[in-house]
């Protein structure tokens, strides 16, 4: 009975303090109601004394209440109070206070009335964030396995007010660790999706050869030869809190996120020769060399729409993070007419560079593609040695010849493919479409060679060759 009376008195003190705060915010900053001061230090002793007597009547169990107050910025008042109570532990109270001027708001007297009725071993933390009239409350009970002793001794409340926030262009992740429990919240982002669904970790050696030949000379043959040699393969399926959703369109929309992480020496060689004229020759050469540079290309929300493409469209979305030495050589050779020749040559060499291509939320729409569109979606994280060879020769017309050759070789690498929940919508494709999303994290030595010759007319010749070689990469 005595404890109930003391608790009621403590609640009355809290109400008086709150009335004082509201009176100060209402415009009477200089004059406060009677019985209350700007900093309620005089009433603090009775308040805590009442709660100590109340807690002393309890035989088992303990609870801890932590108050965090954020008063309006216009009042220049931010006050935090950390109150830790341990029952049957000689009434020890740990209080940390930070006053920056102004008054305090006590908004959780109802929570106190509910927390003291809890049984033994229950531990509650009440955090109130009050900014501009909005209050966010989070109640956690992480440490239920600590207070199982009858006396309730040894209970400690740990609270770390650290928040790690990652804002990646439509992907907002907020990780807050409180009392050893981490909570992830997404705020301020219209698009929130976690892209971790499937993991393949290859530790030792992996050799993959894929051959796919398409011949359309009156008959159709399809031969696929796949060899996989690997050991210590781990597949993990991660189900995120938010599923990937495809919006902003009714059909033919796919979202890609590609990531390529290379940390040491890289050599990229890509050859692409374009011939578009009849007898003309046009050569473009671009050489780029940098040392200890950081390149970030943010391509958030890019939209690529391809309609009625007649000859071979290739869509590649990559995200590269390179921290070591890299060489990129791109040569593009393609022939669309009989005798035209067009050459575009680009060599890229950088030392200790960081390239980061963020292609979050990119949307590619392909409609009415008549001949062969290639779109690649993979995510690779390689820790061992792997060798991948993909050969796709195909013939689409009588005298046409189309060959796609991809040679991939790496050692001491880690391969990670996340292909869960990926959605790929393509409509109206008449001849063979391949969709690939690549995300590569390379920690060892890798060598990639991609050769794509393709021919779409009777005697035309189109060749796309890309060789990728890297050594001592992390």
Swiss-Prot record:
It comes from Gorilla gorilla gorilla (Western lowland gorilla). GO terms for biological process: coagulation; negative regulation of flagellated sperm motility; sperm capacitation. InterPro entries: Semenogelin (IPR008836). Residues 31-40, 137-158, 174-194, 325-334, 372-397, 445-455 have a biased composition (Polar residues). Belongs to the semenogelin family. Residues 292-310, 335-346, 399-426, 456-465 have a biased composition (Basic and acidic residues). One of its GO terms (cellular component) is extracellular region. This is Semenogelin-2. Participates in the formation of a gel matrix (sperm coagulum) entrapping the accessory gland secretions and ejaculated spermatozoa. Residues 24-62, 132-158, 173-194, 226-247, 272-474 are annotated as: Disordered. Interacts with SERPINA5. It is found in: Secreted.
């Amino acid at each position: 009975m005595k404890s109930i009376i003391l608790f009621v008195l403590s609640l009355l003190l809290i109400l008086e303090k709150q009335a004082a705060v509201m009176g100060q915010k209402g415009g009477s900053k200089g004059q406060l109601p009677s019985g209350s001061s700007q900093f309620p230090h005089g009433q603090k002793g009775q308040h805590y004394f009442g709660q100590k007597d109340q807690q002393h009547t309890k035989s088992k169990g303990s609870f801890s209440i932590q108050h965090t107050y954020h008063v309006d910025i216009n009042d220049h008042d931010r006050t935090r109070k950390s109150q830790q109570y341990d029952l049957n532990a000689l009434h020890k109270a740990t209080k940390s206070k930070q006053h920056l001027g102004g008054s305090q708001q006590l908004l959780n007297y109802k929570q106190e009335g509910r927390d003291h009725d809890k049984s033994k071993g229950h531990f509650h933390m009440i955090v109130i964030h009050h900014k501009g009239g909005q209050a966010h409350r989070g109640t956690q009970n992480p440490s239920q396995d600590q207070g199982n002793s009858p006396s309730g001794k040894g209970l400690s409340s740990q609270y770390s007010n650290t928040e790690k926030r990652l804002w990646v262009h439509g992907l907002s992740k907020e990780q807050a660790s409180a009392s050893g429990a981490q909570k992830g919240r997404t705020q301020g982002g219209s698009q929130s999706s976690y892209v971790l669904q499937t993991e393949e970790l290859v530790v030792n050696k992996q050799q993959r050869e894929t051959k796919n030949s398409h011949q359309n000379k009156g008959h159709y043959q399809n031969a696929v030869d796949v060899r996989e040699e690997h050991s210590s393969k781990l597949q993990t399926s991660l189900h995120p809190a938010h599923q990937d959703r495809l919006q902003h369109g009714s059909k033919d929309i796919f979202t890609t996120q590609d990531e390529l992480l290379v940390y040491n020496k890289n050599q990229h060689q890509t050859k692409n020769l374009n011939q578009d004229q009849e007898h003309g020759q046009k050569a473009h050469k671009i050489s780029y060399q940098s040392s200890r540079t950081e390149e970030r290309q943010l391509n958030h929300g890019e939209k690529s729409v391809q309609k009625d493409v007649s000859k071979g469209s290739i869509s590649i979305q990559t995200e590269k993070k390179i921290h070591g030495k890299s060489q990129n050589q791109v040569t593009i050779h393609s022939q669309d007419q009989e005798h035209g020749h067009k050459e575009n040559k680009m060599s890229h060499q950088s030392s200790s560079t960081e390239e980061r291509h963020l292609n979050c939320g990119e949307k590619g729409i392909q409609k009415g593609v008549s001949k062969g569109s290639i779109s690649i979606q993979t995510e690779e994280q390689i820790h061992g040695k792997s060798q991948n060879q993909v050969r796709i020769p195909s013939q689409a017309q009588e005298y046409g010849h189309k060959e796609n050759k991809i040679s991939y070789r790496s050692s001491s690498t880690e391969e990670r493919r996340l292909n869960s929940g990926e959605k790929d919508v393509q409509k109206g494709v008449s001849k063979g479409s391949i969709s690939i999303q690549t995300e590569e994290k390379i920690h060892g030595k890798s060598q990639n060679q991609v050769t794509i010759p393709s021919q779409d007319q009777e005697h035309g010749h189109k060749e796309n060759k890309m060789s990728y070689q890297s050594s001592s990469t992390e």
